[in-house]
Curated annotation (Swiss-Prot):
Cofactors (names): Mg(2+)
Matching HAMAP family: GTPase_EngB
Gene Ontology molecular function terms on file: GTP binding; metal ion binding
Organism per entry: Mycoplasma pneumoniae (strain ATCC 29342 / M129 / Subtype 1) (Mycoplasmoides pneumoniae)
Organism domain of life: Bacteria
Entry's family note: Belongs to the TRAFAC class TrmE-Era-EngA-EngB-Septin-like GTPase superfamily. EngB GTPase family.
Positions with a binding annotation for Mg(2+): 34, 55
InterPro entries with a match to the protein in the record: G_ENGB_dom (IPR030393), GTP-bd (IPR006073), GTP-bd_ribosome_bio_YsxC (IPR019987), P-loop_NTPase (IPR027417), Small_GTP-bd (IPR005225)
Keyword DNA-binding attributed: no
Name used for this protein in its record: Probable GTP-binding protein EngB
Residue numbers binding GTP: 27-34, 53-57, 70-73, 136-139, 167-169
GO biological process, one term: division septum assembly
Length: 193
């Protein structure tokens, strides 16, 4: 089944009101989340931009009879304080109160993992949702950086290394593995850490 855009929502009340299970994609602004989503769908549905902070709504997509949600990016410095707070509140509410949600795909930049990413992992762990950390832009790292990053990422984020996958939306590296692991999030309840 081909992927398609369903709707955008600015708050939980505007989200689809049904019982279809969902997996959401979240990540810092400018980590290549939209490009990764498009690679996952094999179709350009999520809007990509060189300007960080473009996604400020919850964007719902349907693919293979499953629902996926592109969440606004967090941590973009050029947003106003009010905008940052609104996005933080929306993300927190969605993770904690969206009953359809069965899993979270946290997209990070392979080369720049932040304390903010670490805090988001803590928040995800507190929800009890199953999750997967996708380290995108792996193609931008040299061989030495790849080795060190793979060893440090799970330790820094305090998660099981099996929860971390290195990919490149640009080159297609590990996208088939990612595809399979994301669909597994619909089956699992809770996470092993």
């Amino acid at each position: 089944m081909e992927a398609r855009f369903l709707k955008s929502a600015s708050d939980l009340e505007s989200c689809p009101q049904d019982s279809v299970k969902e997996v959401c994609f979240m990540g810092r602004s400018n980590v290549g989340k939209s490009s990764l989503i498009n690679a996952f769908f094999q179709k350009k549905l999520a809007k990509t931009s060189a300007t960080p902070g473009r996604t400020q709504l919850l964007n719902f997509f349907e693919y293979n009879r499953k629902r996926f949600v592109d969440l606004p990016g967090y941590g973009f410095a050029k947003l106003s304080k009010v905008q940052k707070e609104a996005i933080t509140n929306l993300l927190t509410q969605f993770l904690n109160f969206r009953q359809n949600l069965t899993g979270v795909v946290l997209v990070i930049d392979s080369g720049v993992v932040t304390v903010q990413d670490q805090e988001v992992v803590k928040t995800i762990l507190q929800t009890g949702l199953n999750f997967l950390v996708i380290a995108n832009k792996f193609d931008k790292l040299n061989q030495s950086e790849r080795f060190h990053t793979q060893n440090k990422l799970a330790h820094f984020l305090k998660v099981n290394p099996n929860k971390c996958l290195f990919v490149s939306a640009k080159t297609g590296y590990n996208l088939q593995v990612m595809h399979k692991q994301i669909f597994e999030l619909f089956k699992a309840d809770g996470q092993a850490i």
